[in-house]
Amino acid sequence: MSTNPHVFSLDVRYHEDASALFAHLGGTTADDAALLESADITTKNGISSLAVLKSSVRITCTGNTVVTQPLTDSGRAVVARLTQQLGQYNTAENTFSFPASDAVDERERLTAPSTIEVLRKLQFESGYSDASLPLLMGGFAFDFLETFETLPAVEESVNTYPDYQFVLAEIVLDINHQDQTAKLAGVSNAPGELEAELNKLSLLIDAALPATEHAYQTTPHDGDTLRVVADIPDAQFRTQINELKENIYNGDIYQVVPARTFTAPCPDAFAAYLQLRATNPSPYMFYIRGLNEGRSYELFGASPESNLKFTAANRELQLYPIAGTRPRGLNPDGSINDELDIRNELDMRTDAKEIAEHTMLVDLARNDLARVSVPASRRVADLLQVDRYSRVMHLVSRVTATLDPELDALDAYRACMNMGTLTGAPKLRAMELLRGVEKRRRGSYGGAVGYLRGNGDMDNCIVIRSAFVQDGVAAVQAGAGVVRDSNPQSEADETLHKAYAVLNAIALAAGSTLEVIR
């Protein structure tokens, strides 16, 4: 067996339905598998799909400790290499712990050794390099910030996602829907075995005829009604909003984004994902299977909002704040009523509260990027545009900047988290107040899901329009942006509008009708 990892790639047959192909190749039953997809929000056509079919290492961060669990022979070699690289932080087998920084200077705190260092070493120093690999896929929890900032202690929630969890890909399927091309890539210390495994997968892909691509068998739900329960009833949520508005009146904050959780039975998370991608195609769609503290989970969603995107080739950072929401104009049968839709758009565009909230968050995005960008490189590339989805429309903007040459994408993520559209402003004070009223971790909700490539690229989305599924129960979280002029009941209604696409997908997958108790 070779001591140096070997990368092998293979062009394979293109399939339009990447999610069905992912299921055909065993992705819905394999541990540590993941699928990321992207669709054009205007045409709804697929852009790209990226699947991890086999992982070599699972990387889990809890507090200041990171556990790197090798899953294959090549993974064991990678972790051994990592242990040599980060030996001073190696506190137990496959485990690394990092002390909290006591630096006062902001740049010193940002660049001090931290749990981010494990991801950085795996991204840039895994011992192999190819156009497709290394590839890390996974996500950061909203609560990851607590490992760098002091926040009020709160309890665990039904969303038990760790501070971060990624997998280091061993076999990847990369599909370009625009060019109608597909490629398998893999890495292994045993080149012959790897080549044979990829050839076997290639034959399975050839055998996945279009007529059989949709043969995924769903798990039925026992009952005609899917009962959805809000953890915080409307009356209590209105009270929380009024409490938070007092902090706005007092000048503590300008805006804040409280959230609540809708829970529902979800016997088949992948079937729900298929329904969500069909009814609500989005720029960032994801289905992830993971394991944390011995318990398996699934995380799926169709997010409209980029978190932080970094393109290494031109060192451009991009934030995509979304704030301002209206329901789509629908006829009773669910079809689009163009006149009502335009009326709702006009109402949103002329709503002083929505414009104030959105403008505030664009300024916040500019301030976030200022911390890590080349001076005078920031610009608002798009302002107050409208993106339409199946159930809602949003006001959106795009802010760009050039990353400081001394920093990388992980530094930028750490400096910018969490996005203001999920916290409020000022961000740290808003998050302190949110913990005071919510009293639970948010888990994956409001965090990020995406990938890191060995060339330095990073792309991830904010985890919204999503469900965290564990033990057959889905937690669907949604928030509302609260400013001085907010109407508490309108904000409570907005959380359901935002959650509805996911809840409806779960109901469709179960062949049931929704009943929401709020």
Swiss-Prot record:
Q: Which GO terms describe its biological process?
A: L-tryptophan biosynthetic process
Could you tell me which Pfam families the record lists for this protein? Answer: Anth_synt_I_N (PF04715), Chorismate_bind (PF00425)
User: Which pathway, per its entry?
Assistant: Amino-acid biosynthesis; L-tryptophan biosynthesis; L-tryptophan from chorismate: step 1/5
Q: Which domain of life is it from?
A: Bacteria
UniProt entry tagged with the keyword Chaperone = no
| Single GO molecular function | anthranilate synthase activity
Q: Which NCBIfam families match?
A: PRK13564.1 (NF010079), trpE_proteo (TIGR00565)
The role this protein plays is: Part of a heterotetrameric complex that catalyzes the two-step biosynthesis of anthranilate, an intermediate in the biosynthesis of L-tryptophan. In the first step, the glutamine-binding beta subunit (TrpG) of anthranilate synthase (AS) provides the glutamine amidotransferase activity which generates ammonia as a substrate that, along with chorismate, is used in the second step, catalyzed by the large alpha subunit of AS (TrpE) to produce anthranilate. In the absence of TrpG, TrpE can synthesize anthranilate directly from chorismate and high concentrations of ammonia.
* Protein name, per record: Anthranilate synthase component 1
Organism from which the protein derives: Corynebacterium glutamicum (strain ATCC 13032 / DSM 20300 / JCM 1318 / BCRC 11384 / CCUG 27702 / LMG 3730 / NBRC 12168 / NCIMB 10025 / NRRL B-2784 / 534)
Cite the source lineage.
Bacteria, Bacillati, Actinomycetota, Actinomycetes, Mycobacteriales
